Amino acid sequence: MLEGWSVVIDYTASSRPFGMARLLTRYGFRVDRIYADTISPEEEDTIAFLKERCPHILVCPTVHHKMAVLPRGLYEESGGRVLAIGQKAAYFTGTPHFVNMVEDGGLYGCGGILELAGLMQEAAMEEKDTGKLIQVKGWGCFC
């Protein structure tokens, strides 16, 4: 279902975004970006794993001032096959295909992994109205 899709993850979706990336890459998903401003000491081994086995993954800050003006073209560049996990990842890539999840969404263990897989499949099949779901968070609101 998600073969050929690029997956991007942000730190608001998971307390351990690098661990999520490791899990997904081990099961054949192509994770291309992780949006995170800090790296938890608990994830140092995971970072080493990703550097060795997935050197193509970009780690992008979300609070850097240039992030507000960078083009959001990954979605178009990838032929519309970008799946984001988290609202910030959806915003920065411009994709309408995203898992709208915050702080792991209550998912845990094997059941949580299976539920995440279902949410990813659902996000790939159905576009969300990104502008409505991600309102004031830098979307260009003139409030």
Provide a role label for each language-model segment:
Residues 1-143:
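An N-terminal assembly and electron-transfer interface module characteristic of large anaerobic redox
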